[in-house]
Amino acid sequence: VMLTGQQPVVQPAWNIFNKGIAGGEETERIEFLQKNGWEAEIPAISEQEVTIPTEWDEVYAGYASLQQAQGFNLEKLRGKLVTEYTYHITNYPENDDVAAHILVYKDKIVAADISEMQQGGSCTAVIPG
């Protein structure tokens, strides 16, 4: 809530939460994972530039919804080039073929997920909630 002198203005949760989670450095990305209960191998398995689609199909809309639930807003990043870092997660229950994907834009984490890498595997939030 922001006070404007008249009526309080309610800010969306993602706007308050995601003022910027540092992610430009590998140590920052690993710390982000650890703070949320995940252990990852260093260095990243991969680092690649990806573009957030301007038009979202049903799958990407679901991914954006998962990110929104964690406090991230991909809506404002449509068409933007981001860097995707992929880390092998070592403490996922009953599955060792699991990766964390962290999207970084202007040195800030803008999206993250934990994915089972086999065909049909699940994609879940990094941030518990």
Label every PLM stretch briefly.
Residues 35-95:
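Mature extracytoplasmic domains of secretory-pathway proteins
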Residues 14-21, 88-91, 99-100, 114-116:
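Second-shell loop/turn segments in exported
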Residues 1-62:
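N-terminal export/targeting and maturation segments
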Residues 16, 62, 81, 86, ...:
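Residue-level preference for alpha-helix termini and adjacent loops
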